[in-house]
Amino acid sequence: MQNIPKIWCIPQLFVTLQSKTKNKMKQEINPKDTNRAIAFELWTKSPMPMVTLTKTFDVTRLYKVSRRHGLKFNMLLCWCIGKAASTIDEFYMLPKDGKLYKYDRMAINVIADNVKGGLSFCDVAVTDDLEAFNANYLHLTETISQTCQDILDDEAIIVGTSAVTGTELDSITNQYNGIFNNPFLAWGRYRKGWLKTTLPISFQFHHAQMDGSHAARFLEELQRTIDTIAV
């Protein structure tokens, strides 16, 4: 893992970003008034409505940016995920308990090891500002790691993530428990080659939320975002 310098302005950036989004919230909408009407009818009562796609990404640029600027690789990938997902309208709708909700903002759920040897969770608000996202990411992950208290945003659409970096993985299929319908991405350790670094990423989503075409568009946008990230 890379050593990350402490950023003294983290709390200020965190408060500023939170204040911009605190008044936005989710609302229930009529599925028949959306482009998900048919999918909602077909898949909300399905015993297994989740779909998983796996794509191998070229993360060479992320690896170089991480090493060159001393930024966490996982943070950079989470920022790219949020930036790509925010361009897909379907990400802002989510079925839950037989209803469809629309959200005004998005956050990336990050898992961190805590001081008690367990796991803690935090939701990092999505923003186009990489510096602000990095500051919030570091502040929140450090806080939950030390306090063992989750910091979650119930009013944002949450894109779950899980980095299983203890080994290289070809694909990850997450459990479906019928409670969490949120889109979810997971990956293992990246693979460093002579000319490029690659990383298979698995993307799980609820079929009532989006179709395969939307998911494919997101994965393509994620690769473009990775290729063009600038610091």
Predicted segment positions?
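Acyl-group handling in specialized metabolite and lipid biosynthesis
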Residues: 51-54, 62-69, 119-131, 210
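Acyl activation and transfer enzymes in specialized metabolism, enriched
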Residues: 62-87, 199-218
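Helical lid/core segments from catalytic subdomains that handle acyl or acyl-like groups
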Residues: 114-169
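Histidine-centered acyl-transfer/condensation active-site motif
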Residues: 154-168, 183-220
